[in-house]
């Protein structure tokens, strides 16, 4: 599959987000918070939270970048985090089974909330190097969970992510 086809399949495309347009008319506090981050991360935040509520504003205002660039995270380390395992449990049963088998896990199936559960099989067809960085806060993949699941399905040893620390 070609890269442009992949862009169309994605749940969103932060690369085409115009930061200034999206921020237009937003609360000054939100604009100030988002503007602290590199543009690529700003786009990811705005894709995930285009209309932030007060809880979003408080949460993201607490973020501190551990690195000015995305970093390569060891996938095995990410699998040691309970909340990342819970994210796996919210994927379709066949995806959970495939990940459990590949990684020697025993993640139980949970309720699937995903409006597009077929996307994981589509995403795994692409090389991890073509994916945007996920957003990891205190070791938990918060944004880009589909990219994380696809990396697990491919057996990727690393996932590229923004490494963020938060006190909340």
What are these regions (language model features)?
Residues 4-71:
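N-terminal extension/subdomain marker
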Residues 11, 149, 161, 166-168:
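Amphipathic, charge-rich alpha-helical segments that serve as recognition/docking helices
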Residues 16, 53, 108, 159-162:
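A local structural micro-motif
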Residues 20-28, 33-34, 40-41, 63-66, ...:
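Short alpha-helix boundary/capping and kink motifs at helix termini
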Residues 89-90, 158-159, 165:
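General N-terminal targeting signals
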Residues 145-160:
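Short active-site loop/helix that positions an aromatic residue
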């Amino acid at each position: 599959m070609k890269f442009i086809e992949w862009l169309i399949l994605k749940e969103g495309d932060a690369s085409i987000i115009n930061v200034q347009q999206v921020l237009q008319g937003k609360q000054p506090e939100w604009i100030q918070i988002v503007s602290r981050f590199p543009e690529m991360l700003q786009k990811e935040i705005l894709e995930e939270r285009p209309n932030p509520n007060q809880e979003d504003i408080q949460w993201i205002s607490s973020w501190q970048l551990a690195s000015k660039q995305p970093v390569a995270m060891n996938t095995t380390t990410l699998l040691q985090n309970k909340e990342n395992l819970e994210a796996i449990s919210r994927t379709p049963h066949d995806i959970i089974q495939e990940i459990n088998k590949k990684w020697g896990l025993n993640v139980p199936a949970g309720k699937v909330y995903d409006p597009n559960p077929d996307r994981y099989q589509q995403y795994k067809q692409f090389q991890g190097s073509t994916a945007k960085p996920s957003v990891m806060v205190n070791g938990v993949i918060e944004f880009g969970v589909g990219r994380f699941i696809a990396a697990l399905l491919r057996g990727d040893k690393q996932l590229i992510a923004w490494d963020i620390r938060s006190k909340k």
